[in-house]
From Swiss-Prot:
Biological process per Gene Ontology, one example term: L-serine biosynthetic process
Function according to Swiss-Prot or TrEMBL: Catalyzes the reversible conversion of 3-phosphohydroxypyruvate to phosphoserine and of 3-hydroxy-2-oxo-4-phosphonooxybutanoate to phosphohydroxythreonine.
InterPro entries linked to this entry: Aminotrans_V_dom, Aminotrans_V_PyrdxlP_BS, Pser_aminoTfrase, PyrdxlP-dep_Trfase, PyrdxlP-dep_Trfase_major, PyrdxlP-dep_Trfase_small
Organism: Shewanella baltica (strain OS155 / ATCC BAA-1091)
Subcellular location: Cytoplasm
Pathway as given in its UniProt record: Amino-acid biosynthesis; L-serine biosynthesis; L-serine from 3-phospho-D-glycerate: step 2/3; Cofactor biosynthesis; pyridoxine 5'-phosphate biosynthesis; pyridoxine 5'-phosphate from D-erythrose 4-phosphate: step 3/5
Annotated family: Belongs to the class-V pyridoxal-phosphate-dependent aminotransferase family. SerC subfamily.
Protein name per UniProt: Phosphoserine aminotransferase
Cofactor(s) it depends on: pyridoxal 5'-phosphate
Keywords noted in UniProt: Amino-acid biosynthesis, Aminotransferase, Cytoplasm, Pyridoxal phosphate, Pyridoxine biosynthesis, Serine biosynthesis, Transferase
N6-(pyridoxal phosphate)lysine: residues carrying this PTM: 199
Top-level class of the enzyme under EC nomenclature: transferase
Catalysed reactions listed for this entry: O-phospho-L-serine + 2-oxoglutarate = 3-phosphooxypyruvate + L-glutamate; 4-(phosphooxy)-L-threonine + 2-oxoglutarate = (R)-3-hydroxy-2-oxo-4-phosphooxybutanoate + L-glutamate
Co-factor: note: Binds 1 pyridoxal phosphate per subunit.
Length: 363
């Protein structure tokens, strides 16, 4: 069977080595004679798995000791509400930086739960010569007392990424769903990091939360117990039955990433993949991208065919060539190639070859 390269934005492809190992262990995990999906989450064997998973993630991301690592339900959208309910209290205010679809969704959820009076926002994307560009504000010049400032460093729908570290006088809450472990960051700069698993960690249904200890002292609002960070810390992420199979696969992805050289190594590969694809787009008048070079996403490359009438044919022929899930988000249209950690360099080579051949044929 010819290679299939899955460019889906999420749920995204998983490393082939992880998938093969899961396949081999599906009916008999760790010599138990049953699947990992069938054992108690409180068994010593599964507890050992969770401890190793946290240890590997801490090592990969160099997470300081004063941070808790939580494996929770709900995905990224679940955390939109959890952040508000855990940190805002009845009187607190927060600032949301809006750079695209996902930060807008987080803002809308915060305003729904807390009311617009408690939630301020700033649009940080401007047009520069017709292209989207991020302009980070000087937050130190804002006269306000916020519990936290929220932002999304990578917008998967819009193809926008913020590479500069945010400088804030208030705790930073970041949605890293699409960039976690794709490049190195300084975790100590953040009050809380959250990430839906289905892009760079594992299957959907799991979210990772990395929260600094002092954040748990902020006033909270009444909320569901399963989204209460304090209860999650107290119960080692097992206040209720966790998504065990997703946790198992996340553990395998962490181990795989360590075996490939860690985040510093995969970051170089990710940069190379993105550069190859953007060079193809920029070097061919057949395609265009709407983001300034400094803010082009490494994880989610969005592009359009100049002749949009060829979109359907492009997708059809790409599918035949084994290049799947290239259709852009319904809100923005066009094309999108998601280049998460599991996407091999060969996938980009194949995509670039196809794009060049398609352009030559239809120009």
């Amino acid at each position: 069977m010819s290679a299939i390269y899955n460019f889906c934005a999420g749920p995204a492809m998983l490393p082939a080595a992880v998938m093969k190992k899961a396949q081999q262990e599906l009916l008999d995990w760790n010599g138990q004679g049953v699947s990992v999906m069938e054992i108690s989450h409180r068994s010593k064997e599964f507890i050992a798995l969770t401890e190793q998973a946290e240890s590997d993630l801490r090592e990969l991301m160099q997470i300081p000791a004063n941070y808790h690592v939580l494996f929770m339900h709900g995905g990224g959208r679940g955390q939109f509400s959890a952040v508000v309910n855990n940190f805002l209290g009845e009187q607190g205010k927060a600032l949301y930086l809006v750079s695209g679809q996902w930060s807008s969704a987080a803002l809308a959820e915060a305003q729904k739960l807390a009311g617009e009076a408690q939630i301020d926002s700033l649009n940080i994307v401007e047009k520069h010569n017709g292209l989207n560009a991020v302009v980070l504000p000087d937050l130190h010049k804002i006269d306000a007392d916020y519990r936290y400032v929220h932002y999304c460093p990578n917008e998967t729908v819009d193809g926008i990424e913020i590479f500069d570290e945010l400088d804030s006088p208030w705790p930073i809450v970041a949605d890293l769903s699409s960039t976690i472990m794709s490049r190195e960051i300084d975790v100590s700069r953040y009050g809380l990091i959250y990430a839906g698993a289905q892009k760079n960690i594992g299957p959907s249904g799991l979210s990772i939360v990395i929260v600094r200890d002092d954040m748990l002292k902020l006033p909270s609002l009444p909320q569901s117990s399963i989204m209460d960070y304090r209860l999650a810390v107290e119960h080692d992420s097992m206040f209720n039955t966790p998504p065990t199979f997703a946790w198992y696969l996340a553990a395998e992805v962490f181990a795989w990433l360590k075996s490939t050289g860690g985040i510093s190594s995969i970051a170089k590969i990710n940069q190379q993949k993105a550069q190859m694809l953007y060079q193809c787009i920029d070097g061919n008048a057949f395609y265009r991208n709407g983001v300034v070079a400094a803010n082009r996403s490494q994880m989610n490359v969005t592009f359009q065919l100049v002749n949009e009438a060829l979109d359907s044919e492009f997708l059809k022929q790409a599918q035949i060539a084994g290049l799947v899930a290239l259709k852009g988000h319904r809100i923005v249209g066009g094309m999108r190639a998601s280049l998460y950690n599991a996407m091999p360099l060969d996938g980009i080579v194949a995509l670039v070859k196809f794009m060049n051949e398609f352009a030559a044929k239809h120009s």
